[in-house]
Amino acid sequence: IMEAHLIPPKDVPEFWYEIKPLIDKALVHGEEDVNADDLLAPIINGKCFLWIVVNDLEIVSICLGEFCEYPRKKSFYINAWATKSGYEYDEVMETFNGSVVNFAKINGCDFIEAKVRKGLAKKLKWNDKHSLVTLTL
């Protein structure tokens, strides 16, 4: 059974060797020229939040995001999202509602947003807005 866990900032260095390649895998598709090492400090200082999905003690997916304050609304913006296999999104998404979605709601977010490739937008059945998908909470 897959389970999602929010990694406390103090524990990130312990898992970094396993998490870093997954973050880089997600970021390689962006235009921002950002890599996992660029995001380590924001994760450790609590600006970004790192979720892992574990299956039988193996990290199979990561989700990295941060809060974005707009004049009238607040979002949880997902910076990086990847599975180790490149598949298993259905199984990972089963953990998403009880973890990332609840986390965003508890923290006063009105929606979740993520910039994704078109294929993932279609698979998630989220609103595709120029590859920026949103989930209203």
Predicted regions and their residues:
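A residue-level signal for beta-strand positions that form part of recognition/binding surfaces
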Residues: 1, 75, 130
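Short amphipathic alpha-helix that is part of the acyltransferase structural core
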Residues: 1-34
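Charged/polar, solvent-exposed surface patches and flexible loops
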Residues: 14-21, 25, 38-42, 94, ...
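Active-site rim helix/loop that mediates acceptor-substrate recognition in acyltransferases
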Residues: 28-49
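Conserved donor-binding loop and adjoining core beta-sheet/short helix segment
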Residues: 45-87
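Conserved catalytic-core motifs of GNAT/GCN5-like acyltransferases
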Residues: 115, 128-137
